[in-house]
Amino acid sequence: MKYAGILAGGIGSRMGNVPLPKQFLDLDNKPILIHTLEKFILINDFEKIIIATPQQWMTHTKDTLRKFKISDERIEVIQGGSDRNDTIMNIVKHIESTNGINDDDVIVTHDAVRPFLTHRIIKENIQAALEYGAVDTVIDAIDTIVTSKDDQTIDAIPVRNEMYQGQTPQSFNINLLKESYAQLSDEQKSILSDACKIIVETNKPVRLVKGELYNIKVTTPYDLKVANAIIRGGIADD
Protein backbone atom coordinates (compact mmCIF):
# COMPACT_ATOMS: atom_id res chain seq x y z
CA MET A 1 0.00 0.00 0.00
CA LYS A 2 0.96 3.62 -0.45
CA TYR A 3 0.64 6.21 2.27
CA ALA A 4 1.13 9.97 2.39
CA GLY A 5 2.57 11.64 5.48
CA ILE A 6 2.16 15.42 5.64
CA LEU A 7 4.50 16.99 8.16
CA ALA A 8 2.68 19.90 9.78
CA GLY A 9 4.73 20.11 12.95
CA GLY A 10 6.32 23.53 12.51
CA ILE A 11 5.47 26.40 14.83
CA GLY A 12 6.60 29.11 12.42
CA SER A 13 9.33 30.74 14.54
CA ARG A 14 11.05 32.12 11.43
CA MET A 15 7.82 33.68 10.20
CA GLY A 16 8.00 36.40 12.84
CA ASN A 17 5.15 37.71 14.97
CA VAL A 18 2.23 35.73 13.58
CA PRO A 19 -0.67 34.20 15.57
CA LEU A 20 -0.65 30.79 13.87
CA PRO A 21 1.90 28.18 12.81
CA LYS A 22 3.01 28.78 9.24
CA GLN A 23 1.00 25.87 7.80
CA PHE A 24 -2.21 27.72 8.73
CA LEU A 25 -1.25 31.08 7.25
CA ASP A 26 -3.34 32.38 4.38
CA LEU A 27 -2.19 31.91 0.80
CA ASP A 28 -4.65 33.08 -1.84
CA ASN A 29 -7.60 32.89 0.56
CA LYS A 30 -6.92 29.49 2.08
CA PRO A 31 -4.30 28.04 4.44
CA ILE A 32 -1.02 26.76 3.03
CA LEU A 33 -1.84 23.32 4.47
CA ILE A 34 -5.03 23.12 2.41
CA HIS A 35 -3.16 23.92 -0.82
CA THR A 36 -0.71 21.11 -0.04
CA LEU A 37 -3.38 18.63 1.01
CA GLU A 38 -5.37 19.19 -2.18
CA LYS A 39 -2.41 17.97 -4.23
CA PHE A 40 -2.39 14.66 -2.36
CA ILE A 41 -6.15 14.21 -2.51
CA LEU A 42 -5.88 14.17 -6.32
CA ILE A 43 -3.66 11.07 -6.14
CA ASN A 44 -5.85 7.99 -5.93
CA ASP A 45 -2.92 5.70 -5.09
CA PHE A 46 -2.88 6.60 -1.40
CA GLU A 47 -4.56 4.34 1.13
CA LYS A 48 -4.29 7.04 3.80
CA ILE A 49 -3.22 10.68 3.91
CA ILE A 50 -1.92 11.31 7.42
CA ILE A 51 -1.38 14.82 8.75
CA ALA A 52 0.96 14.99 11.75
CA THR A 53 0.70 18.19 13.78
CA PRO A 54 1.54 19.35 17.33
CA GLN A 55 -0.98 18.13 19.90
CA GLN A 56 -2.14 21.66 20.72
CA TRP A 57 -3.00 22.27 17.05
CA MET A 58 -4.81 19.01 16.29
CA THR A 59 -8.28 20.45 16.95
CA HIS A 60 -7.48 23.53 14.87
CA THR A 61 -6.27 21.29 12.04
CA LYS A 62 -9.52 19.32 12.06
CA ASP A 63 -11.56 22.53 12.24
CA THR A 64 -9.62 23.90 9.25
CA LEU A 65 -10.40 20.78 7.22
CA ARG A 66 -14.10 21.17 7.99
CA LYS A 67 -14.08 24.89 7.22
CA PHE A 68 -12.66 24.26 3.75
CA LYS A 69 -14.91 21.23 3.18
CA ILE A 70 -12.07 18.70 3.03
CA SER A 71 -13.92 15.46 3.68
CA ASP A 72 -11.79 12.79 1.99
CA GLU A 73 -12.18 9.69 4.16
CA ARG A 74 -8.51 8.80 3.70
CA ILE A 75 -7.38 11.80 5.75
CA GLU A 76 -6.36 11.29 9.38
CA VAL A 77 -4.88 13.80 11.82
CA ILE A 78 -2.40 12.54 14.40
CA GLN A 79 0.02 14.00 16.90
CA GLY A 80 3.48 14.81 15.60
CA GLY A 81 6.76 14.17 17.36
CA SER A 82 9.47 16.22 19.02
CA ASP A 83 11.27 16.80 15.73
CA ARG A 84 10.94 16.06 12.02
CA ASN A 85 12.12 12.47 12.07
CA ASP A 86 10.26 11.68 15.28
CA THR A 87 7.13 12.95 13.53
CA ILE A 88 7.75 10.67 10.56
CA MET A 89 8.23 7.70 12.88
CA ASN A 90 4.98 8.60 14.68
CA ILE A 91 3.23 8.37 11.32
CA VAL A 92 4.87 5.00 10.68
CA LYS A 93 3.76 3.74 14.12
CA HIS A 94 0.22 4.91 13.38
CA ILE A 95 0.19 3.03 10.09
CA GLU A 96 1.55 -0.09 11.77
CA SER A 97 -1.03 0.01 14.56
CA THR A 98 -4.02 0.61 12.27
CA ASN A 99 -3.17 -1.25 9.07
CA GLY A 100 -0.05 -3.28 9.72
CA ILE A 101 2.94 -3.00 7.40
CA ASN A 102 3.61 -5.19 4.38
CA ASP A 103 7.00 -5.62 2.72
CA ASP A 104 6.12 -3.42 -0.27
CA ASP A 105 4.36 -0.61 1.62
CA VAL A 106 5.75 2.87 0.93
CA ILE A 107 5.29 6.29 2.47
CA VAL A 108 5.58 9.65 0.72
CA THR A 109 6.52 12.28 3.32
CA HIS A 110 6.09 15.96 2.52
CA ASP A 111 6.37 19.35 4.19
CA ALA A 112 2.94 20.87 4.80
CA VAL A 113 4.42 24.24 3.83
CA ARG A 114 5.51 23.19 0.34
CA PRO A 115 2.20 23.85 -1.45
CA PHE A 116 3.52 23.78 -5.02
CA LEU A 117 4.52 20.16 -5.47
CA THR A 118 3.21 18.61 -8.66
CA HIS A 119 1.37 15.48 -9.72
CA ARG A 120 4.54 14.38 -11.55
CA ILE A 121 6.72 14.75 -8.46
CA ILE A 122 4.33 12.70 -6.31
CA LYS A 123 3.94 9.93 -8.90
CA GLU A 124 7.69 9.71 -9.53
CA ASN A 125 8.29 9.51 -5.78
CA ILE A 126 5.86 6.62 -5.46
CA GLN A 127 7.41 4.74 -8.36
CA ALA A 128 11.00 5.31 -7.22
CA ALA A 129 10.18 4.27 -3.64
CA LEU A 130 8.64 1.04 -4.94
CA GLU A 131 11.66 0.33 -7.15
CA TYR A 132 14.57 1.55 -5.02
CA GLY A 133 13.33 1.80 -1.43
CA ALA A 134 14.32 5.41 -0.76
CA VAL A 135 14.03 8.61 -2.77
CA ASP A 136 14.76 12.30 -2.31
CA THR A 137 13.34 15.16 -4.37
CA VAL A 138 16.05 17.60 -5.45
CA ILE A 139 16.87 20.44 -7.81
CA ASP A 140 20.24 21.35 -9.27
CA ALA A 141 22.22 23.78 -7.13
CA ILE A 142 22.11 27.14 -8.90
CA ASP A 143 24.64 29.01 -6.79
CA THR A 144 28.13 27.89 -5.88
CA ILE A 145 28.12 26.18 -2.47
CA VAL A 146 30.87 26.81 0.06
CA THR A 147 31.48 25.05 3.37
CA SER A 148 32.79 26.67 6.54
CA LYS A 149 33.25 25.16 9.98
CA ASP A 150 34.06 28.40 11.80
CA ASP A 151 31.56 30.69 10.03
CA GLN A 152 34.48 32.93 9.11
CA THR A 153 36.54 31.22 6.41
CA ILE A 154 35.92 28.80 3.55
CA ASP A 155 36.95 25.20 4.11
CA ALA A 156 35.92 23.85 0.72
CA ILE A 157 34.06 24.71 -2.48
CA PRO A 158 32.38 21.54 -3.78
CA VAL A 159 31.98 20.98 -7.51
CA ARG A 160 28.66 22.66 -8.31
CA ASN A 161 27.45 20.12 -10.86
CA GLU A 162 27.61 17.50 -8.11
CA MET A 163 25.53 19.61 -5.71
CA TYR A 164 21.75 19.48 -5.33
CA GLN A 165 19.26 21.29 -3.13
CA GLY A 166 16.98 18.99 -1.21
CA GLN A 167 13.21 19.44 -1.27
CA THR A 168 10.34 17.15 -0.39
CA PRO A 169 8.66 14.71 -0.90
CA GLN A 170 11.06 12.18 0.56
CA SER A 171 9.70 8.69 0.14
CA PHE A 172 10.57 5.29 1.55
CA ASN A 173 9.79 1.64 1.76
CA ILE A 174 8.36 1.69 5.27
CA ASN A 175 10.19 -1.38 6.56
CA LEU A 176 13.49 -0.07 5.17
CA LEU A 177 12.93 3.24 6.97
CA LYS A 178 12.03 1.52 10.24
CA GLU A 179 15.01 -0.81 10.13
CA SER A 180 17.44 1.97 9.22
CA TYR A 181 16.17 4.25 11.98
CA ALA A 182 16.51 1.46 14.55
CA GLN A 183 20.18 1.05 13.60
CA LEU A 184 21.05 4.65 14.51
CA SER A 185 22.44 5.65 17.89
CA ASP A 186 20.65 8.24 20.02
CA GLU A 187 23.45 10.67 19.17
CA GLN A 188 22.96 10.12 15.43
CA LYS A 189 19.21 10.60 15.79
CA SER A 190 19.67 13.83 17.74
CA ILE A 191 21.56 15.57 14.92
CA LEU A 192 19.48 14.36 11.98
CA SER A 193 17.84 17.20 10.07
CA ASP A 194 16.76 15.18 7.05
CA ALA A 195 14.87 11.91 6.70
CA CYS A 196 16.98 10.67 3.80
CA LYS A 197 20.06 10.88 6.02
CA ILE A 198 18.55 8.02 8.03
CA ILE A 199 19.11 5.86 4.96
CA VAL A 200 22.47 7.39 4.03
CA GLU A 201 23.81 6.90 7.57
CA THR A 202 23.13 3.17 7.26
CA ASN A 203 25.00 2.99 3.94
CA LYS A 204 22.00 2.39 1.72
CA PRO A 205 21.35 4.19 -1.59
CA VAL A 206 18.81 6.97 -2.04
CA ARG A 207 17.41 7.59 -5.52
CA LEU A 208 16.99 11.16 -6.81
CA VAL A 209 13.79 12.55 -8.33
CA LYS A 210 13.90 15.97 -9.95
CA GLY A 211 11.84 18.61 -8.17
CA GLU A 212 10.86 22.06 -9.36
CA LEU A 213 12.39 25.45 -8.63
CA TYR A 214 8.98 26.71 -7.51
CA ASN A 215 8.46 23.83 -5.05
CA ILE A 216 9.48 26.21 -2.28
CA LYS A 217 9.17 25.81 1.47
CA VAL A 218 7.27 28.72 3.00
CA THR A 219 9.10 29.49 6.25
CA THR A 220 9.72 33.27 6.24
CA PRO A 221 7.71 36.39 5.38
CA TYR A 222 9.77 36.66 2.18
CA ASP A 223 8.80 33.09 1.22
CA LEU A 224 5.14 33.94 1.72
CA LYS A 225 5.46 36.89 -0.66
CA VAL A 226 7.15 34.65 -3.22
CA ALA A 227 4.40 32.03 -2.82
CA ASN A 228 1.71 34.63 -3.48
CA ALA A 229 3.63 35.79 -6.56
CA ILE A 230 3.82 32.19 -7.82
CA ILE A 231 0.05 31.85 -7.54
CA ARG A 232 -0.66 35.24 -9.14
CA GLY A 233 1.71 34.46 -11.99
CA GLY A 234 0.24 31.02 -12.64
CA ILE A 235 3.72 29.49 -12.51
CA ALA A 236 2.75 26.28 -10.71
CA ASP A 237 -0.39 25.16 -12.51
CA ASP A 238 0.35 21.41 -12.46
Swiss-Prot record:
Catalysed reaction equations from the record: D-ribitol 5-phosphate + CTP + H(+) = CDP-L-ribitol + diphosphate
Protein's job: Catalyzes the transfer of the cytidylyl group of CTP to D-ribitol 5-phosphate.
Recorded family membership: Belongs to the IspD/TarI cytidylyltransferase family. TarI subfamily.
Binding annotation for CTP: L7, A8, G9, G10, G81, S82, D83, R84, N85, D86, T87
Organism in which the protein naturally occurs: Staphylococcus aureus (strain bovine RF122 / ET3-1)
EC number(s) reported in the record: 2.7.7.40
Keyword field: Cell wall biogenesis/degradation, Nucleotidyltransferase, Teichoic acid biosynthesis, Transferase
UniProt site (Positions ribitol 5-phosphate for the nucleophilic attack): R160, K217
GO biological process: cell wall organization; isoprenoid biosynthetic process; poly(ribitol phosphate) teichoic acid biosynthetic process
EC main group: transferase
NCBIfam families linked: PRK00155.1-3, PRK13385.1
Record-given protein name: Ribitol-5-phosphate cytidylyltransferase 1
UniProt GO molecular function: 2-C-methyl-D-erythritol 4-phosphate cytidylyltransferase activity; D-ribitol-5-phosphate cytidylyltransferase activity
PANTHER family for the chain: 2-C-METHYL-D-ERYTHRITOL 4-PHOSPHATE CYTIDYLYLTRANSFERASE, CHLOROPLASTIC, RIBITOL-5-PHOSPHATE CYTIDYLYLTRANSFERASE
Gene: tarI1
Pathway note: Cell wall biogenesis; poly(ribitol phosphate) teichoic acid biosynthesis
Keyword Nucleotidyltransferase recorded: yes
Annotated site, Transition state stabilizer, chain positions: R14, K22
